Amino acid sequence: MRLVISGGGTGGHIYPALALIEALKAEGKLDDVLYVGTKRGLESRIVPATGLKFATLDLQGFKRSLSLSNFTTVRKFLGSLGEAKKLLQDFQPDIVVGTGGYVSGAILFAATRLHIPTVIHESNSVAGVTNKFLSHFVDRVAIVFPEVAKAFPANKVVVTGNPRAQQVAGLKPNDRLRDFGLDPHIRTLLAFGGSRGAPRINDAVVAALPIWAKADFQVLFATGRTHYDQIKAKLPDLPATIKVVPYIDDMPSILPDIGLLISRAGATTLAEITALGIPAVLIPSPNVTHHHQFLNAQSLTKQGAAITITEDELDNHFPRRVVTLMEDDEKRAAMAKASKKLGVPDASDQLIAVMTTLLSKRR
């Protein structure tokens, strides 16, 4: 299979694409792949580092409000279609897949005009603007959250899960916590707000640390690189059971030894924790389109797999709520079971099946 794939802007669009590529390689189904992104997006740093072929288009996203820059957005989109078609004609893909973000718009639309089989993947509970637009032209729409199906043409939708889930589903408890001076046999709370950190989560955790320091569990707190020095400087002396770090490389590898996670509710994080059955306290970012992180979190909370706490609810009761949950093994076990039930450990295989079925119909 010759594949062109595009997704960018955030890790939530990039990592599912990379997970799909990895699965195709593992199954011996990938002859060649070209990743299409932008020069400015996060994908421009992440994808080339993997050794994949990487091409760029000059695009930008829409502003949600009335803005003159939206005229530039349209102009760049229309202007990039010719370049996108040339990329496709030169590479000659069998199929083109988009995993979200404005960058995927031009290459997917161009593929539909060239009658190349196309699939888009929507990882959130609210459809992205680009995916909503593309859904009217592509062949299939793969989704994670069933509730987002209503945003797309019903005859194109298939529930596959997030490919990132399959990438982590086989992980087992290990000694990774020892790298941080913690005991993998002791109940562990992991708190982080993403690679850049989340100031409101950081503030809430810093305020809670003196209380958690007296509890019978250990804490690993990743502040985000930007905030680490400032936070470390103002922390009091803490016991050996609490470790504060700027960032955790290969975050999924540590999850099997985590008793409770405090984090944002991005699609990739939720795919990972449900694949592994990790109970979570989810604090959705309010700074995302259509509050999709809140809706992502609610999808887990309604099934008993997580607790949703908004930033406005990060009050003086937050530290004790976490202690109560950490001390309630039965409650966390029930949450873990519910989380695992929501996981899709074969998500990549399901998406690949959609792709191969589509290709077989075109032959």
From Swiss-Prot:
Function of the molecule: Cell wall formation. Catalyzes the transfer of a GlcNAc subunit on undecaprenyl-pyrophosphoryl-MurNAc-pentapeptide (lipid intermediate I) to form undecaprenyl-pyrophosphoryl-MurNAc-(pentapeptide)GlcNAc (lipid intermediate II).
Gene name of this polypeptide: murG
Reaction(s) this enzyme catalyzes, per UniProt: Mur2Ac(oyl-L-Ala-gamma-D-Glu-L-Lys-D-Ala-D-Ala)-di-trans,octa-cis-undecaprenyl diphosphate + UDP-N-acetyl-alpha-D-glucosamine = beta-D-GlcNAc-(1->4)-Mur2Ac(oyl-L-Ala-gamma-D-Glu-L-Lys-D-Ala-D-Ala)-di-trans,octa-cis-undecaprenyl diphosphate + UDP + H(+)
Pathway terms, separated by semicolons: Cell wall biogenesis; peptidoglycan biosynthesis
Chief place where the protein resides: membrane
Keywords attached to this entry: Cell cycle, Cell division, Cell membrane, Cell shape, Cell wall biogenesis/degradation, Glycosyltransferase, Membrane, Peptidoglycan synthesis, Transferase
Subcellular localization(s) per the UniProt record: Cell membrane
Membrane topology: Peripheral membrane protein
Name the UniProt record assigns to this protein: UDP-N-acetylglucosamine--N-acetylmuramyl-(pentapeptide) pyrophosphoryl-undecaprenol N-acetylglucosamine transferase
Binding residue positions for UDP-N-acetyl-alpha-D-glucosamine: T10, G11, G12, N124, S195, I248, Q293
PANTHER family: GLYCOSYLTRANSFERASE, UDP-N-ACETYLGLUCOSAMINE--N-ACETYLMURAMYL-(PENTAPEPTIDE) PYROPHOSPHORYL-UNDECAPRENOL N-ACETYLGLUCOSAMINE TRANSFERASE 1
GO biological process terms held by the UniProt record: carbohydrate metabolic process; cell division; cell wall organization; lipid glycosylation; peptidoglycan biosynthetic process; regulation of cell shape
Similarity field: Belongs to the glycosyltransferase 28 family. MurG subfamily.
One of the record's GO molecular function terms: undecaprenyldiphospho-muramoylpentapeptide beta-N-acetylglucosaminyltransferase activity
Enzyme Commission code: 2.4.1.227
EC category name: transferase
GO cellular-component term (any): plasma membrane
Alphabetized Pfam families for the sequence: Glyco_tran_28_C, Glyco_transf_28
